Amino acid sequence: MTNVYFLDIFMFVYVLQFLFYFKESMLGVLVNKFLGLLVVVFSYTDSLPLSSVISVFTFLVLLTCCFGGYFMYSFCPCGMIEFTFVYAMVAWLSTLLTFITSEKFSIYISKAGDSFLKTFSMLLVELVSEVSRPLALTVRLTVNVLVGHVISMMLYQLLELYLGIFYVWIVVLAIVMECFVFFIQSYIFSRLIYLYLNE
């Protein structure tokens, strides 16, 4: 079984060309369809054309971190508050800097016809609202991923207790539930970044 024959290599290369090498390869078509679906899900707008790209990139990075951490180390890095806080700060700063460079920022700070006291108090309220966003993103992502992990593991332990360890589909069900939590939380986080960009 350790012998490698020419026909084996030929068949391997023959299959690989359909996956990678042609202009319309199977893998390329699959990736293009998936990315097109993500752009549709994140509802591309003409006012901020890069907002959907940033959201899709955020979604894919978080999904990669979740799956990579879970399948390599059996713990998702999005469940660690340090990782999510740093990622939320970077994402929030990118949205804040995009917002500051737009023309809406001066209208956002002071509206015409308002008194000084009202403008000052509204500025403080808006400032607190802006500064609390990375903390809200951090807590939302961390807690939801941890709660999803705990609930899926509790269900797994409960099913294993009553049905025994002989059912392989219980382990598969627990992994599928974890993956579902990763998809949902990555989507919610990137969707919030998209909404912050479109304000």
Curated annotation (Swiss-Prot):
Molecular function GO terms recorded: proton-transporting ATP synthase activity, rotational mechanism
Give TM segment ranges: 2-22, 25-45, 53-73, 80-100, 143-163, 164-184
Q: Keywords on this record?
A: ATP synthesis, CF(0), Hydrogen ion transport, Ion transport, Membrane, Mitochondrion, Mitochondrion inner membrane, Transmembrane, Transmembrane helix, Transport
The record, for InterPro entries, names: ATP_synth_F0_asu (IPR000568), ATP_synth_F0_asu_AS (IPR023011), ATP_synth_F0_asu_bact/mt (IPR045083), F0_ATP_A_sf (IPR035908)
Q: Does the keyword Membrane apply?
A: yes
Q: Superkingdom of this entry's organism?
A: Eukaryota
Q: How does it sit in the membrane?
A: Multi-pass membrane protein
**Location within or outside the cell:** Mitochondrion inner membrane
Please give an example of a GO cellular component term from this record: mitochondrial inner membrane
The UniProt entry's sequence similarity note says: Belongs to the ATPase A chain family.
What is the annotated quaternary arrangement, including any partners?
A: F-type ATPases have 2 components, CF(1) - the catalytic core - and CF(0) - the membrane proton channel. CF(1) has five subunits: alpha(3), beta(3), gamma(1), delta(1), epsilon(1). CF(0) has three main subunits: a, b and c.
Q: Please explain the role this protein plays, according to its UniProt record.
A: Mitochondrial membrane ATP synthase (F(1)F(0) ATP synthase or Complex V) produces ATP from ADP in the presence of a proton gradient across the membrane which is generated by electron transport complexes of the respiratory chain. F-type ATPases consist of two structural domains, F(1) - containing the extramembraneous catalytic core and F(0) - containing the membrane proton channel, linked together by a central stalk and a peripheral stalk. During catalysis, ATP synthesis in the catalytic domain of F(1) is coupled via a rotary mechanism of the central stalk subunits to proton translocation.
* PANTHER family per record: ATP SYNTHASE SUBUNIT A
Instruction: Please give the name of this protein.
Output: ATP synthase subunit a
Q: Which organism is it from?
A: Ascaris suum (Pig roundworm)
List the top taxonomic levels of the source: Eukaryota, Metazoa, Ecdysozoa, Nematoda, Chromadorea
